[in-house]
């Protein structure tokens, strides 16, 4: 079984994590490293994917500045989303040819990993036809957003954001993923208490390893 190298980055600015992803993706493309997984949190940040509409950012620049919320135009797929402490972010740097060479299948694998994590907490995670991510309560509320990019050399960047215990009011600043008729939720809200982020991270690592047939190994990141 191939190794999955896992790096914990703690809380890190979106742009700084993006720089790290690009460097690791270049190394993965050249075969200098194997499949890699970054786990982290972001400070309050709104990101716009390549399908995002600017008017789906509902707050004014002045309001966002007053609340300390950064806004970043990203090169990931998808629309507008919100990041904040208490949200577990996972960025896989994978050579897709080793996982079926199909972006849709890869995204379904990320969804499956999260669905299995939720099952461990007694929650039923679901897919919604025509939408990306993981949902609960029969598709009424989104608990995990997914947006990825595939490079010309077939290496993935960006990934998933699982709401463990973020301040959900931040999602009121946007139209999350361009969807107006469904809400956003978290593990803390659904369970009535927040599991430790480190515990959720360990479970997510294990499930990504199982779904993608990789053996996780946690290492410090040397850049």
Curated annotation (Swiss-Prot):
GO terms for biological process: protein modification process. CDD domains: LipB. The keyword Cytoplasm applies. The record marks 142 as: Lowers pKa of active site Cys. SUPFAM superfamilies: Class II aaRS and biotin synthetases (SSF55681). PROSITE patterns: BPL_LPL_CATALYTIC, LIPB. It catalyses: octanoyl-[ACP] + L-lysyl-[protein] = N(6)-octanoyl-L-lysyl-[protein] + holo-[ACP] + H(+). Residues 31-216 form the BPL/LPL catalytic domain. GO terms for cellular component: cytoplasm. Keywords: Acyltransferase, Cytoplasm, Transferase. Its EC number is 2.3.1.181. The active site is at 177 (acyl-thioester intermediate). Disulfide bonds: none annotated. Pathway: Protein modification; protein lipoylation via endogenous pathway; protein N(6)-(lipoyl)lysine from octanoyl-[acyl-carrier-protein]: step 1/2. HAMAP family: LipB. Catalyzes the transfer of endogenously produced octanoic acid from octanoyl-acyl-carrier-protein onto the lipoyl domains of lipoate-dependent enzymes. Lipoyl-ACP can also act as a substrate although octanoyl-ACP is likely to be the physiological substrate. PANTHER family: LIPOYLTRANSFERASE 2, MITOCHONDRIAL-RELATED, OCTANOYLTRANSFERASE. In the reaction, the free carboxyl group of octanoic acid is attached via an amide linkage to the epsilon-amino group of a specific lysine residue of lipoyl domains of lipoate-dependent enzymes. This is Octanoyltransferase.
């Amino acid at each position: 079984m191939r190794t999955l190298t896992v790096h914990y980055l703690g809380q890190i600015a979106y742009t700084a994590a993006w720089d790290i992803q690009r460097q690791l993706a270049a190394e993965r493309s050249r075969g200098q490293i194997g499949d890699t997984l970054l786990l982290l949190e972001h400070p309050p940040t709104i990101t716009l994917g390549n399908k995002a509409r600017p008017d789906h950012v509902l707050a004014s620049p002045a309001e966002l500045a007053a609340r300390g919320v950064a806004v970043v135009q990203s090169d990931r797929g998808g629309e507008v989303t919100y990041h904040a402490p208490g949200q577990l972010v996972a960025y896989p740097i994978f050579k897709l040819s080793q996982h079926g060479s199909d972006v849709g299948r890869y995204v379904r694998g990320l969804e499956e990993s999260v669905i299995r994590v939720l099952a461990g907490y007694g929650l039923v995670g679901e897919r919604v036809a025509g939408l990306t991510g993981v949902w609960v309560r029969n598709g009424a509320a989104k608990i995990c957003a997914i947006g990825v990019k595939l490079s010309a050399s077939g290496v993935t960047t960006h990934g998933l954001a699982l709401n463990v215990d973020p301040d959900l009011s931040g999602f009121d600043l946007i139209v999350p993923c361009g969807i107006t008729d469904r809400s956003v939720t978290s593990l803390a809200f659904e369970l009535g208490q927040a599991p430790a982020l480190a515990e959720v991270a360990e479970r997510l690592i294990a499930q990504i390893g199982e779904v993608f047939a990789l053996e996780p190994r946690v290492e410090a990141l040397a850049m």
